[in-house]
């Protein structure tokens, strides 16, 4: 009974394998750059496979330290977005209460919880945007009164055309509203 009245789609957000992978790779690479730069400054081999006497501190060692620090900062930033689960949440379409609820986690602070609620009567249509090319975009939007369009698909790896079509059609049928393609 509740399945007929409530649909809930979970959104993964930043806790994707690719983010774990890139955070780890950037951390290892940046650590290597920083240790190599410090090795050239101290004239001590901090890494067993690097010969510090072959690297002059100014300018090569200094630049390597700079890139290492930048990489570590970026790696920590990516790690924190994973830890805080930024972008994850759910889309809930509730016929029982007559509400559409879009919930996402943001960065810590005053607006950490992004919680949008709309009456089902305010939802006018479902719009699908398909853009092919080098960076394809396949997005489903919820069109709400007041010319607002709220994306309800996940960010990251684009969904297949079949997945987009199926999810948009199911949602439009469930909400009994129009579906159009841009």
From Swiss-Prot:
It comes from the Eukaryota. The keyword Transmembrane applies. The chain crosses the membrane at residues 22-42, 63-83. One of its GO terms (biological process) is photosynthesis. One of its GO terms (cellular component) is chloroplast thylakoid membrane. Keywords: Chloroplast, Membrane, Photosynthesis, Plastid, Thylakoid, Transmembrane, Transmembrane helix. It is found in: Plastid, Chloroplast thylakoid membrane. The keyword Oxidoreductase does not apply. InterPro entries: PSI_Ycf4_assembly. Pfam families: Ycf4 (PF02392). It is a multi-pass membrane protein. Its main location: plastid. Belongs to the Ycf4 family. Seems to be required for the assembly of the photosystem I complex. HAMAP family: Ycf4. This is Photosystem I assembly protein Ycf4. It comes from Oltmannsiellopsis viridis (Marine flagellate). The gene is ycf4.
């Amino acid at each position: 009974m509740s399945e007929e009245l409530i649909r809930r789609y979970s959104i993964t957000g930043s806790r994707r394998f690719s983010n774990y992978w890139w955070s780890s790779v950037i951390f290892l690479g940046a650590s290597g750059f920083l240790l190599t730069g410090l090795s050239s400054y101290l004239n001590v081999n901090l890494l067993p496979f690097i010969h510090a006497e072959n690297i002059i501190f100014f300018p090569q060692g200094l630049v390597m330290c700079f890139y290492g620090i930048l990489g570590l900062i970026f790696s920590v930033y990516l790690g924190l977005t994973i830890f805080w689960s930024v972008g994850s949440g759910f889309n809930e379409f509730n016929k029982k209460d007559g509400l559409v609820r879009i919930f996402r986690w943001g960065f810590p602070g005053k607006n950490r919880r992004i919680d949008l609620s709309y009456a089902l009567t305010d939802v006018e249509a479902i719009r699908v945007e398909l853009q092919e090319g080098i960076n394809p975009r396949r997005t489903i939007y919820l069109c709400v009164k007041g010319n607002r369009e709220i994306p309800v698909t996940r960010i990251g790896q684009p969904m297949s055309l079949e997945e987009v079509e199926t999810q948009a059609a199911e949602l439009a049928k469930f909400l009994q509203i129009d579906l159009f393609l841009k």
